[in-house]
From Swiss-Prot:
This is Probable Xaa-Pro aminopeptidase PEPP. Belongs to the peptidase M24B family. Mn(2+) 2 binds at D264, D275, E438. One of its GO terms (biological process) is proteolysis. SMART domains: AMP_N. The gene is PEPP. Its cofactor is Mn(2+). CDD domains: Prolidase. Mn(2+) 1 binds at D275, E398, E438. SUPFAM superfamilies: Creatinase/aminopeptidase, Creatinase/prolidase N-terminal domain. The keyword Magnesium does not apply. GO terms for molecular function: manganese ion binding; metalloaminopeptidase activity. Keywords: Aminopeptidase, Hydrolase, Manganese, Metal-binding, Metalloprotease, Protease. Binds 2 manganese ions per subunit.
Length: 469
């Protein structure tokens, strides 16, 4: 593990700096110089028709301004006085029997980057006190995240609109501490990907490799997964977000081992996510067709990475990936025509239907990307990030090529579009399923910092697979 990451993470999560950043964004948007930011953490939720609680996931905007993972907590930030207060639950004697003593206010003050820690029973009193001192200013909150017992009546004005935008836009550019968390999530996830690659040849089922990935993440400190892992063997990899992860690696219809395993998985470290995809040849060596597609996708990714720097239009990176895909598929004979004609007609969307990447942070598809899912251009419809890249933003770079009959068949059936695809050549590639290669990178002023060290050079992957029986 990187010791420089340990040194950064030895300090407190910079909640106070984040609160200032959100308040500054509120001012920039024209909503005033003062007031109170109010946020609630996620509530403990019970499983329906059961006395057990749901797995807990802290609200991301609350964590951003508090660094606190505790359920049923609250916070206020007095913008004018630059004062951040965390409210944590009081002792519940019944709960102590089962769960032990909770964190005390003094312990929480020592642990989190806040100015004061009170109990949740003090929230309304604290809000009323602010109004009495400040003659009832404005409160900024999220409309669907205010508990029924909380009252804003003493305030002259309640704004339920700007806080969400201000927080989500503030989260786009990461500070040093956040990048250290993302780097550690990538370090651990890389270890898990390597463990999967080494076990791929001997595994019998997708779930075995998923279990190895999760266990490795857990052992190094990622107690949660960033998202439901994707372990897609053979043609299952043609489904972008395959979820089953439970099929045998030997195809029951042919009796032969499937060609590849697409692994899209990342551990979550202290609320921050890794999102990494690799493709592994299950036999230890890529088939000729698999290697051809892999090389195209790797070229798509490497040329995309070379373009990344502050100020670059993400749409340009995405468009370039389509052009690289078109050139590669033309060379293989899968596509027919000219590069310009195929690009203008959107033929590459049949094989590369998703965006080249998205923001990454506390959410896998992190905030601030401003996607346009109503875009009439199919190349951009599922691009989750639009506009220029900011220095300090973290993005995924994840081009792919897929052989999904559900997506490709309508193109083949179209008299206008089908002529651009050679079905005889295409027939050789269906069993490849899909190839996606995904790294996580920090945008810098003159380039990028790739956080992902998992092997992606095909010879390196083959060597790791083949070395383990």
């Amino acid at each position: 593990m990187d010791e420089s990451v340990d040194r950064v993470l030895a300090g407190k999560y910079p909640a106070k700096a984040h609160a200032k950043r959100v308040a500054a964004r509120i001012r920039e948007l024209g909503y005033g110089e003062s007031g109170v930011i109010y946020l609630e953490g996620q509530k403990t939720q019970m499983i329906e028709d059961n006395d057990g609680s749901m797995p807990f996931r802290q609200r991301r905007n609350f964590f951003y301004l508090s660094g606190c993972p505790l359920p049923d907590s609250y916070l206020t930030y007095n913008i004018e006085e630059d004062h951040l207060t965390l409210f944590i639950p009081p002792i519940d004697e019944d709960s102590v029997i089962w769960s032990g003593l909770p964190l005390s206010p003094d312990e929480a003050l020592e642990m989190y980057d806040v100015d004061a820690v009170l109990l949740t029973t003090d929230v309304n009193t604290s809000l009323a006190h602010f109004c009495s001192v400040k003659k009832g200013k404005k409160v900024f909150a999220l409309a669907d995240q205010v508990s029924p017992h909380i009252t804003f009546l003493p305030f002259q004005e309640t704004d339920f609109d700007v806080l969400k935008r201000a927080a989500e836009e503030s989260r786009v550019v990461k500070d040093t501490y956040e990048i250290a968390l993302l780097r550690r999530a990538n370090e651990i996830s890389t270890k898990a990907h390597v463990a999967v690659i080494k076990a791929a040849r001997s595994a019998a089922n997708e779930r075995e490799l998923e279990a190895i990935f999760i266990a490795t993440c857990m052992s190094y400190g990622c107690r949660e997964q960033s998202y439901h892992p994707i372990f897609a063997s053979g043609t299952n990899a043609a489904t972008l977000h395959y979820q089953n992860n439970n099929e045998d690696l030997v195809d029951k219809t042919t009796g032969e081992k499937r060609l590849n395993m697409l692994v899209d998985a990342g551990g979550e470290y202290r609320t921050y996510c890794a999102d990494i995809t690799r493709v592994v040849p299950l036999s230890g060596k890529f088939s000729a067709e698999s290697r051809q597609i892999y090389d195209i996708v790797l070229d798509m990714q490497m040329t995309s990475l070379a373009m990344i720097r502050a100020g670059v239009m993400w749409e340009d990176v995405h468009s370039n990936s389509h052009r690289v895909a078109i050139r590669g598929l033309l060379k293989l004979g899968i596509l027919r025509g000219t590069e310009e004609e195929l690009f203008d007609k959107g033929i590459s969307v049949a094989f590369f239907p998703h965006g080249v990447g998205h923001y990454l942070g506390m959410d896998t598809h992190d905030t601030g990307g401003n996607p346009n899912y109503e875009d009439e251009n199919p190349k951009f419809k599922y691009l989750r990030l639009r506009g220029t890249l900011a220095c300090g933003a973290v993005v995924t770079v994840e081009p792919g090529i897929y052989f999904c009959r559900f997506i490709i068949d309508p193109y083949l059936a179209s008299p206008e579009l089908g002529k651009y695809i050679d079905t005889n050549v295409l027939e050789r590639y269906w069993n490849v399923g899909g190839v996606r290669i995904e790294d996580n990178v920090v945008v810098t002023q003159n380039g990028h910092d790739n956080l992902t060290a998992a092997p992606k050079i095909p010879e390196e992957i083959e060597k790791l697979v083949a070395a383990t029986q």
